[in-house]
UniProtKB/Swiss-Prot annotation:
Residues 337-353, 507-519, 628-644, 685-697, 731-750 have a biased composition (Polar residues). Residues 1569-1659 form the Ricin B-type lectin domain. Gene3D superfamilies: 2.80.10.50, Crystallins. Residues 105-118, 841-851 have a biased composition (Basic and acidic residues). Residues 825-835 have a biased composition (Acidic residues). Keywords: Lectin, Repeat. Residues 986-1023, 1024-1067, 1073-1113, 1114-1156, 1168-1213, 1214-1256, 1262-1302, 1303-1345, 1356-1393, 1394-1437, 1443-1483, 1484-1525 form the Beta/gamma crystallin 'Greek key' domain. GO terms for molecular function: carbohydrate binding. It holds the Pfam family Crystall. SUPFAM superfamilies: gamma-Crystallin-like, Ricin B-like lectins. The lineage of its organism: Eukaryota, Metazoa, Chordata, Craniata, Vertebrata. The gene is CRYBG2. InterPro entries: Beta/Gamma-Crystallin, Beta/gamma_crystallin, G_crystallin-like, Ricin_B-like_lectins, Ricin_B_lectin. Residues 72-135, 148-168, 242-268, 297-321, 337-380, 411-757, 808-871, 883-903 are annotated as: Disordered. This is Beta/gamma crystallin domain-containing protein 2.
Amino acid sequence: MEEAGGPMARAKARVVSATLTWRQRPPTQEEIKHGFHKVSLVSGAQMEAPQKEMFEFSRREEVEVNGFATQEEETVNCQGPRDTAGSKNFQSHGPIFSKKYIPPPKEKRPEGRLKEAVDQSDGSRQAPRTEPPCVGAMARTELLVPLPGPREPSPHPGVGLTSGSSRSLEEYRVTRTVRTTTVVGGHVDRRMSSSVTVRPVSSGEALPRGRQVSRMVPPVVVGSPPGSPSRSQAVKVLSNLVPAGHSPPASHLPRPTAGGPRSTGLGSTVGAALRQLPETGTAELKDSSALASTGIPASAHLPKNQDAPAACPDRDQGRAPDARACELWQVLGAPSSTELPLQTSQGQASVPSSPRLETHVPSPGLTHPAKQPVVPTHPGARLTPLVLPPKKKDGPVDPPAATVLPMVRSEHVTVPGQPPAPSTTRRKDVPSPGGLSAPSSPRNKFVQNSENVPVLPFTQREVVKGPGAPAASSPTRKEVVQGSSASAASSPTWKEVVKGPGAPAASSPTQKEVVQGSSAPAALFPTWKEVVKGPGAPDASFPTWKEVVKGPGAPAASSPTQKEVVQGSGAPAALSTTPKEVVKGPGAPAASSPTQKEVVKGPCAPAASSPTQKEVVQGSGAPAALSPKSTEVVQGPKGSSSIQKEAVQGIAGSLAPPLTKEETVQGPIAPATSLPKQDKGVQDSEGSPISSLTQKEVVQDPDALPAPSSSVDRVSPSPGGTPAPVPTGAEASTESQLVSDPTEGKTCTETSREEDEVALAADLEIFLDTLRSMEPPEILRTHRLPRAPRSSYLSMYATLPAIEEDQLGPWVLGPGPQEVPSLEEKEEEEEEEPENPYLSDDEKLQRRQEKAGPSPSRDLHPARPTQVSCSPLEMMKKHVAGTKGPHSELGLELQGGSRPTSRLGGSLLFGSLVPTAKEASTPEPLGTKLSALLPHGAPGLRKVPGQLPLLCSERSSPTEKLACSLPLEGWSPALKTQGKLNTRPGKVIFFSESGCQGSGREVWGDIVDASGWAPVASIRVVRGCWVLYEEPEFRGQKLVLPEGDMELRTPGTKWSPQGIGSLRRVVWDYSTPEISLFSEEGLKGEQVKLTEALKNSQGLEKPLQVASATVSAGLWLLYPKPLFEDTPYILEPGEYPTSEAWGTSDPSVGSLKPMRLGCPSVEKPGEPRAVVYEAPGFQGRSWEVSRDIYNLQQPEDSQSPHLASVGSLRVLGGCWVGYEKEGFRGHQYLLEEGEYPDWSHWGGYDELLTSLRVIRTDFGDPAVVLFEAMDFEGHGVEVSKALPDVELVQHGPSTQAIHVLSGVWVAYQEVGFSGEQYVLEKGVYRNCEDWGAGNSTLASLQPVLQVGEHDLHFVSKIQLFSRPDFLGDHFSFEDDQAALPASFRPQSCRVHGGSWILFDETNFEGDQHILSEGEFPTLTAMGCLASTVLGSLQKVSLHFSEPSIFLYGLECFEGKEIELSREVRSLQAEGFNNHVLSVRIKGGIWVLCEHSDFRGRQWLVGSCEITNWLTYSGTQRVGSLYPIKQRRVYFRLWNAALGGFLAVPDHVEDMKAGRVVVADPQAGGSCIWYYEDGLLKNQMAPTMSLQVIGPPSPGSKVVLWAESRLPRQTWSISESGHICSQMFEGQILDVKGGRGYDRDHVVLWEPDEDRASQIWTIHVL
């Protein structure tokens, strides 16, 4: 034999190529031109009588890998029989490669092995070659050598006793010289060892296993010419490549048992050369008689490690394959006809598939062009492409015998008859009676098929092969499927280990999948594993996220949740996750996904029931392929493969055009049954069920019947194939249905069938019991976290476009996408849509009936247009071309993000239910206001601190709220036509002292001469815009008075005169201000017209020169400097022909602005009072009213005057609404406090004013939501400030529903607050008729504000009237009154601000009558008898604690206990006994009433303890009770010991937390606090509250934190001045003290009388 060595050049990955080829002729040019880097195994099937021949092999190899330089010289002399020339069909095996492997530390290596090991050459025990773990280690190698042992017979019927070849005459002569150079951290270590071994080979010995060397160069497979050495001889030579000094210790070597039947691997195997692949050793079978007894000749044993390398030295793993990408071909050897005649196919040609999706479709029997690597055609030849392996992926292969594979986490495997060895942490005991379970390396999967079905999963590529060439592929995992006598090859990523019959199960701790063939014992896999088991394999238990695929005779495996069980006699299934592609055929493995429970059973496997979300498919030949998401199912006659690059090969090896999305290819003899609703089961004649869920295409080989598919109706038949109809909308069910198998037992051997059935029956009962005891996965679904998306080497092209119909999010563990009806029902049950609270009971019932009834929009099977077919790579490229910015990563990458995704996103059925991008944002809080309502949801109830529950929904995004509701800069209502101008009354108050203090004078209109007034120090303009004149008759120097307060004596004021000459109101309506500026005098030259303020005229194209001007509307201020600086010139309406007319000779203008009216306002909302006059000008009869008047012309009582009309009126207090017609209908007019001399001043359309109504509500914190559709549907926007045009917030032009969240609003039909007025109070308005409009036009709106609302001063006041209905003489009190005037007998009263107690006697004695804020027109309304005479009154003190009261049935707080924290109208109605003898109040101030409904005698009780209620009140019962509700009170907390206020020194509005210290009032910061629902809040940060950070120990810091933090930390302020924590009992607020930097910080401390800093004084504003 001749030896050819490859070049020793170092690749980029520091790998030197080495070539070992087997041939008997000089290499051809085709072979030499490639840089071979492989170890080609050449084997032939023995078909005739053998002949003897001498063989000699010598080899010299020098390899340097990652710093290890190894030189080996070997000579092998073999003498033995050789098969007759011409009777061999040689098969070139794929290259055997491996990547650098770093062995685990010694203490973590697998234990529990047998004690003895026999060396392959000399029988001496060898230690594994390892390097100590250090930083400088360049590479590590460990040889894990399986022990020799007997082979088990194949259970397949095609394998029989075929003796005829013997190696008894062979002799091994091996001379090894190994030179090793190791570079570790700069240290060079050179070692050399030499050994010579001469020994005969017995017939029963197993062939040695080849040694693997780490390489990373493109391999090219060249077919061996005829006449090459026999396969067994090649195997012997390669097996001797293992150095003599590197066999592992005996403790690491497994000893196979002879109990369970194990089949040898039939056919050839291919392996993927990856990094971190262990160098496996060899094992020899010492006893050939064991094999002979099982029916397998000794010559039938194949090498245990035959790997085809798949390597590409491309560093950029993210790039897609290009022209330079290596093409990796893998040739699968077919078994000899004597071994398995059922799987031989004649005339198959190998057709390459390039990484660019170049698809060749040759006819049957077609061979390649000469330029491509050629593999000779012979029976059973199979061709499978290899794809680029990503970095850091492992792919060790598994031999038929047990192989010890290195692990990261050890798992203890127990063998029958051998005590388990002590195991370290994270180990699991796996009993394996049928064979020794060997741990596999992490993230590796081996698949061994029982029918010689190698399954090759590769990355993002698919080759579908004809008869006899099954291969399952998954785009993101490496799967290696081994047949009963064939090894498996693994693909670059996500390796899976699937083992065939006779192969022990491999236990993998994480991220592994194991598929076992017949007679293979099961392994235990903790998490994320998939197990495929063959016949005769005992069941395995899988905790979570597992998939079980079982062959014939394999008992069912139980898995608690998210399981898939696929059973079949022919071949186990290779399982892959999403996106999944499944290839199946008679005898081909099926792929299933881990998201649903699926049960696929073979002929010898009873049906296993799974609780929920299962799909059951039965078949005799192959298990079903079940893949809920992105599944591709390709079924060939004897197997097929699927990857996302698809090439479908026909019967004789022809290729079909590449398919896209999901495809289903069925081979001959593969009929498919239609899927029932919600359960899919497809069964072929060989028992090969197939299920394809969504967006699939069907490609069928000849004689294939239609296969079910859904969504995409496309058929791409291969040569001779018949198109299969693709039904749409096939649903999967939550209940499994078992499809019976008519051909059960066809592929099971007669000898093992009875034993398998017995074992299966027992295991099935255990499995069913386990399933019955499990909880349904719906319970666990909410506890699962989203699964992280897996990376792909195609990430540069983003991911595939999102599936348009019903794509589940990445965290959804529920049913598949076809389960539309079941999902609808579950969503309606679990996520029931909130009912619209605005609807009446009848409307709600009608809505429920509409939802329950059929609807055309609920059609689940609409017609779908066919989609253009293109490859996934092309779709991704198109997808990238049209994608920008952060949206380039779609699919799982996008779904795995922070934003929850919806499976309805691209749905044709439910796409309209998903809000658009701008509506999908999360609503932002608006302080105490409710957030805006989001679309497609009925408004719900939301609690607002200190307010009643308000109706709201989630409809608006932050961009649609107040942030964008403010008027845009440069907006002018003059651009649109205004309607009727609405006017406002005027009011100015002049004070004699600064700060608006002292005596005051109210002015309602123009004052021609005010020279006789007393000196004025400050002015408060309540309404309107006024001008002060220095002289009477509106002459002299002028001063503009806008709305607000102004000091006249301050240095900054430009008012020099000592007195006021005259006063005039210049702006009284909402007309648009307008001024025209001319460049020449006399109103000539270039004209510039303005309606808005101009901040800086220098920003114009040329300087603004103003020589004359005309003011058409409003009052304008012209400033000589930009930004409204310096003293302005005031221009009232009129013409100014020269600049001297407004007091200057300089024509330049720096800036100018108009004066506008503000929002409507009310000063005394709780004191409504108006005087109505019959004639204009306040003439004629008058009528003073303080209540609603239904009809002014027809009074309700006889005492009121009858007014024929209303000519004028004065509003003295409160906010009123006047109506044109009686009964509060017709045109509406807002009436503020002021004077209205005639109907034009209140903005009337005519003189009619028939009814009046008082607005009694809270004017603070206004907020309103506008909807474009009725019943609060459609687009909604929230507004909280005046809006001159609703289009500024992208709303309108139609408004058909309004929800006033708080405050009082005035809406206008036209822009600029003009046209018809509509007064809106807190509540909901379903349509425009509800607010009095005839159409839905609403163009502008503004709130009604309360004067002095933001002064934060708390005033509690009571008004007593001598007559009912607030008539007659009246007295107002703000303090306690021990005695009322003897001549004054109150008959009605009003309470403002707080609560008051009225006593029947003086000095606060007698019966109590507690009155909260409101109006009480009679004594009966006040809770008094008609004859009651009130003697004194007292104000209820403030409290700062949450209400809590305890009622006891016996004295001294004994007996039954009733705890309450809310009002109770009747204790008996609540089920309590109203007999009470003692009371304890822990918080709040309570009113206890003698009878129900707050009737009878009343007692006001604060925080106290009453040991005997009978003695205190004179009664033994409490009928009803309620806590006093207190309005918001602002206060300061004074610490007398430190001389400072509790303050927040920082601006915490935009901070997560704020410091809280004791500071001087002049130090800055905010020291104003308020108490709300138990929380202490600062006025500067209303969304934060006082909270303790850290453990509640003395000295823990107290800061301001978001009030949404849970649990809520509430506080109470006791009468003693302690601020107590309600959450941490016994802890109060204190100051740290000391001399540190944080000595002034507020902390938590235990009460201590010696610490005066714990006492706080409340200063109410």
